[in-house]
Amino acid sequence: AASDVYKRQARTCADILKSLEDLKNLPANTPTMPPLFPTEADREAFNKRHHREHVHIGTLEGAQGPHFLGIDAGSTTIKATLVNDDREIVWSSYATNEGSPLTAAVNIVKQIQSQLPEGAWIARSCATGYGEGLITTGLHLDEGVVETMAHYRGAEMVSPGVTAVIDIGGQDMKYLAISDGVIDSIAVNEACSSGCGSFLQTFAQSMGLTIEEFTQAALNSTHPVDLGSRCTVFMNSSVKQAQKEGASMEDIAAGLCYSVVRNALYKVIKLRDSGELGDTVVVQGGTFLNDAVLRAFELLTEREVTRPNIAGLMGAYGAALTARMHYSDVADGLDLSLIHI
C-alpha cells in the first residue's frame, strides 16, 4: 500500500520546476501599490512626454564669440556646461571627481580650451555646489552662486513660472518652493540616504542588478510592493519579508522606487497635499534619470512634471546662466595661465 501511495505521489523534475515557477504568480500578502504603467498606452504617453528636448544641445564646431562656463562641484561628482550667448549648451561634462574636485575642474577647463575654435572664448565663469568656494578660488573664476539659486535659474529657463524644484542626487535632496519668481522655502536632506539615489543603488547591488537592470525590472512590475517610507536599515527587513511572501524582484524594485519618492515627499518636503507643489514642477538630479522613480513621483503627486533633458546638469547650467547674466564687455574672461595645480 505504501508503495502505491509513493507511485501516486511521484513527480518528475519538470513537474517540480513548473510548480516552483507557478509560485511566482501567487499574490503576496504584502500590501501593494498601483503599477507604474497599467497599460502600454500609459507607458507610450510617458515616454513621449519625457524624452523630448527642453534645452538645445549643440557643439563647439563653428562656435564664435563669448561663452559662459558653469561648474557644479558636488560631493562625489563634478558637472560642467558651456553655453553660448543664446543660452544653448555647446559642451558639457558629468563625471566623478575621483576625490579631487579641483583637479577635475582644471581638467574640464583644459578640455574646453583645447576644443574652443578661434574666435570663441570663455568670457565669464561661475561655480556652484559643495565645492563652490574651492573651485572659484582655485581656478580664479569670476564668481560663485549658491546651489539653490543655480538650480532655480536652470529650472526657470526650462519651465518659465516654475513653482517647485525637486532635485534628488545620489547622497542628498533639495526642494525649492517658488512663488512669483521668489524662493519661498527650502528643504534639504543630507543626513539620510533613504530619499536619495544611493538608497536604490544599494538595493540594486544586493539584488545582483545594475541600476539600469533594476530600473527596467521596476518598470515591468505589475504589483509593486508597498514598502512604506522607512530608513535603509528597516527597509532591509521589509524587503526580506516581501521576498518570503513570494513578491517578485520586479515588484520589490518598483516598491523601492515608490519608497524613495515617499521619503522625499513626506519626510523631507513634509508635503501635506500635492497642491502645495503648484502647477509647474521641475524635477532634476541624477536619481530622476531613473524612469521608475519619475513615474512613481507623478503617480504619488497626481500631476505631470517636467524632467529636463539635462536633469543631471541643471546646477551647472544654472551657474552658466548666472555667468551670462553678469557678463559685461569689459570682462577679461578666464585666464588659464593663473591656474597652478
Go through the PLM ranges and name each one.
Residues 1-4, 92-97, 143-208, 307-310:
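Glycine-rich phosphate-binding loop of actin/hexokinase-like ATP-binding domains
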Residues 194, 201, 205, 210-243:
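Conserved ATP-utilizing enzyme core subdomain
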Residues 1-3, 130-131, 259, 272-298, ...:
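Glycine-rich phosphate-binding loops at beta-strand->alpha-helix junctions
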Residues 2-9, 341:
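Short, small-residue-biased leader/transition segments that mark boundaries at the very start
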Residues 48-64, 132-169, 174-179, 185, ...:
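Conserved phosphate-binding catalytic cores of ATP/NTP-utilizing and phosphoryl-transfer enzymes
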Residues 48-57, 255-277:
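Phosphate/ATP-binding catalytic cores across multiple sugar-kinase/actin-like superfamilies
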Residues 237-266:
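Adenine-nucleotide phosphate-binding core of ATP-dependent small-molecule kinases
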Residues 11-147, 279, 295-309, 329-335:
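N-terminal glycine/serine-rich phosphate-binding loop of ATP-dependent small-molecule kinases
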